[in-house]
Amino acid sequence: MTKVLLVGESWVSSATHYKGFDQFGSVTFHLGAEPLVAALKGSDFDLTYMKAHEAAESFPFDMDGLDAWDVVILSDIGSNTFLLPPAVWLRSETVPNRLRLLKAWVGKGGGLLMCGGYFSFQGIDGRARWRRTPVEDALPVTCQPWDDRVEMCEGAVAEVLRADHPVMAGLGGAWPPILGVNEVEAREDAEVLARVPEAQGGHPLLVLGRHGQGRTAAWTSDIGPHWLSPAFCAWEGYGRLWRNLLGWLAARG
């Protein structure tokens, strides 16, 4: 079994409800990775889902911890969660820099995937802050210095540029629409397998690369709503896309 660690894709929201003179508050916990979890169930990929609030203290602080995994997925989680665990934020203690650790782990053969979202790449208002980090060094793309969201409310159907690539196997025909991406720049030595149509900006959607002995990838849209339409999540190619991509990332060398 290929061991995959998915980090992020959860959040907490609070709301105030007004009913005439009266009001009350509510708090809701949300999960964003359920389509991917369902798609990998019963497959050759053993997925562990580390929620965003757990990652501050539970994401490994040493190489032995990372070596338990073949592929790490960062999805909709900002760099501050890794840089400001409670030991640093509350007690001003020093801890290993997990962004540097992750880069080194990829360099010696680990597989790394960053998926898009409001707190991926540079993110909403630039708050994800992955630009100019060691993790960006390992990715096949570079982040913009600004709010990098590209909202496409009209929908965009991906243009597949490398239908012959193993990651694209079994994914023929038109893909269902996506509703947005993070704007990135593909590195010169990277492979852009799919992009947004040129008329909608031509932004990279799926990019592959290598860092040292490891393989890396960037998927610049969501892994579920809201940037992935319900049709995309229900598409028979949805699970195949992720299985193909994770299989490629897990292959060493």
Predicted regions and their residues:
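Short alpha-beta junction capping motif
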Residues: V4-L6, W11, G65-I124, R210-W219
